[in-house]
A protein has these predicted regions:
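Gram-negative outer-membrane beta-barrel transporters
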Residues: 1-62, 66
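Extracellular loop and loop/strand-boundary signature of outer-membrane beta-barrel proteins
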Residues: 24-28, 66-72, 140-145
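Residues that define the transmembrane beta-barrel architecture of outer-membrane proteins
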Residues: 34-36, 76-80, 94, 149-153
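Transmembrane beta-strands of outer-membrane beta-barrel proteins
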Residues: 40, 50-54, 82, 96-100, ...
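C-terminal beta-signal and adjacent terminal beta-strands/loops
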Residues: 60-63, 87-161
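Short, well-ordered amphipathic alpha-helices
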Residues: 81-87
Length: 161
């Protein structure tokens, strides 16, 4: 159960007395620390100077804060990328490489970061008026996610002298 500490004399724009809630948690996961991160890279040499890489990354579900609450958790995700590399032969250049990357090939919608603001409201239920707010047994959570890019392309040129 939360421990309630009244904050005497707190006054901010005539808010009067406020209450500070404190709750201790034990044996919780560390925020933004998934249990599993798996990365693989397969390289196929299509020709002597041309290669294709398939790069996959899986990240297990992870919590936004250190409470291990299901209301404050990011879903797991899998992202696949392709990289096509062509080695060029140029005069006066030791190494020349042209690279085309297609990131998030399957155009997955995922979020790998978020923020949380916890608050208590005793006279008003804000969860119906704001899509970013959900309620739990201890109060309300305002959660914002940072969605990652869908399919995107990157073209690069590497020159070594």
């Amino acid at each position: 159960d939360p421990v309630i500490y009244p904050v005497e004399g707190f006054d901010m724009q005539s808010m009067g007395k406020d209450t500070l809630f404190h709750k201790s948690y034990e044996n919780t996961d560390i925020s933004f620390s998934p249990n599993i991160i798996w990365v693989s890279q397969f390289n196929y040499k299509l020709k002597k100077e041309l290669s294709l890489d398939i790069i996959s990354k899986y990240v297990d579900e992870q919590f936004i804060d250190n409470t291990s609450s299901e209301n404050r958790k990011l879903d797991d995700y899998l992202v696949n990328n392709l990289q096509l590399t062509y080695n060029l032969k140029l005069k006066n250049v030791n190494e020349a490489r042209l690279t085309l990357m297609v990131n998030n090939v399957l155009n997955n919608q995922y979020s790998n970061r978020a923020w949380i603001y916890r608050f208590v409201s005793q006279g008003w239920d804000p969860s119906g008026s704001d899509p970013y707010i959900n309620a739990d047994s201890d109060g309300y959570n305002m959660v914002g996610h940072f969605p990652q890019a869908g399919r995107n392309y990157l073209l690069g040129l590497t020159l070594g002298f």
